[in-house]
């Protein structure tokens, strides 16, 4: 399978660079996986597609203000993007500077704070701060907006680039399908008899990295930490027993659940995952998916194609472009039911 199979033309004007006034104000493109039929709706119409007894699984990770600006004590400006918090004082981070800091180099953080570069791990730098990391980030850090939102972060992003149910700090990118849900909509979903459960996957900056190989089978995913608790496993078993569907909110929820069921049996799991879902890989847990529109040639578009079928997915994206849907993190959403017999690019005539 070629990466180029997942390319499509996207006008720059369709990239959403700011959130809408209301979280639930987005449009919703509904894709029926078994038939490929499309319906153009509003996000609040999601209620009509959920059934009593369904279980919605959300990712409760919390985005940290992971971008820092500063300079080396020896001179030279730099930018730090925290990838993973290792403990109360240490992180793994991307460092952008004219000259990479060497081991032992001291970094002075704008707004106050200091860190030492203690080791390098491939492209990541291990930094040790003189004070606790999370409070420092909250005080002087910037929200790590994706590279395609080519503007500085502002005060609104602190609220809007975060789900209303975010709880466990550690992500450096938002699980964006969840951004559409406000508390009023969550209450309506609960009132309909839809259950909810929460997994955690701390989204890393690697989610924005392009696929740099020609054949997708040669691509290696970055690692991210996740947790699927026994309570979630029990909730899914109860959902199955009552005939409900497992509805994943976001590709990170999909990757969490399918990572915990790699051998076909769902079990509680806590640790790193590098699961790569592309056409041809079976799904063991998820029946329906709420997701945003993803970048051309991205691993997330490949995941959606595996779930809905390649021709159905690409046709839906073509329709979304034609209808002027807003793309990416602050954009519109899809609701997709799983295609029981998905085809890949190689199955095209």
UniProtKB/Swiss-Prot annotation:
Keyword Transferase recorded: yes
Origin: domain of life: Bacteria
Keywords: Cytoplasm, Queuosine biosynthesis, S-adenosyl-L-methionine, Transferase
GO molecular function: S-adenosylmethionine:tRNA ribosyltransferase-isomerase activity
The reaction(s) this protein catalyses: 7-aminomethyl-7-carbaguanosine(34) in tRNA + S-adenosyl-L-methionine = epoxyqueuosine(34) in tRNA + adenine + L-methionine + 2 H(+)
GO annotation terms (biological process): queuosine biosynthetic process; tRNA wobble guanine modification
Main location: cytoplasm
Compartment(s) of residence: Cytoplasm
Pathway: tRNA modification; tRNA-queuosine biosynthesis
One Pfam family per UniProt: Queuosine_synth
Gene Ontology CC terms: cytoplasm
InterPro entries: QueA, QueA_dom1, QueA_dom2, QueA_sf
Hydrolase among keywords: no
EC number(s) given by UniProt: 2.4.99.17
Family classification: Belongs to the QueA family.
Complex and partners: Monomer.
Function of the molecule: Transfers and isomerizes the ribose moiety from AdoMet to the 7-aminomethyl group of 7-deazaguanine (preQ1-tRNA) to give epoxyqueuosine (oQ-tRNA).
Protein name: S-adenosylmethionine:tRNA ribosyltransferase-isomerase
Organism: Pseudomonas putida (strain W619)
Gene: queA
